[in-house]
Amino acid sequence: SDIETASLFIFLNRTCFNGLYRVNSKGEFNVPHGKYVNPRICDKDNLLAVSELLQRVEIMCGDFAETEKFASVNSIYYLDPLYKPLSETSSFTSYSKDGFDDSEQVRLRDFCSRIAQNNATFIASNSDPVGDRTGESFFEQIYYQFKIKRVYATRLINANPNNRGLVSEIMISNVGNL
């Protein structure tokens, strides 16, 4: 049932490594268990409040391009794709079974261009190769017609706790003041 599926998802999210969700090439969940002594599995008040808010929301599961038909002046898109790897050791792009390589990044840029033409607002986030000093200007090249702002975000998921902390990311948008 839908309730059982949602319950199992919440359980996995609360008990797996840092609440990470990813699947292997077969589409199977493959995150190791976390090392929690007493994880808080269910926050009843929060679940009920979120459930009430979601009654007015349509959630779609599928390719981002399928939402293009909804793009209008009243639409706001926040796009948080798999981030472009900054190094060979950070090349994990497989939260989904199909991955998200440079060609997918370009397909996302094309999507952003089309929804912007329909007067929809979008904000996309990604890794920052320039801020990471790799010198790569991939995003500046493909998103040259949009605004790019650098921000710092806290990263809590990393196998090496010493590598957790603030990292530079980019916000790409078709609105003036990010």
Question: Can you annotate each of these PLM segments?
Answer:
Residues 1-78, 82-93, 107:
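SAM-dependent nucleic-acid methyltransferase catalytic core
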Residues 10, 122, 172:
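A residue-level signal for conserved active-site and pocket-lining positions in enzyme catalytic cores
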Residues 47-50, 66-68, 111-112, 138-139, ...:
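Short, flexible, glycine/charge-rich loop motifs used to bind or transfer phosphoryl groups or to couple energy/partner
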Residues 88-89, 133-134, 160:
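Short glycine-/acidic-enriched loop or helix-start segments at secondary-structure transitions
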Residues 104-154:
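Conserved Class I SAM-dependent methyltransferase catalytic core
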Residues 142-178:
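Class I S-adenosyl-L-methionine
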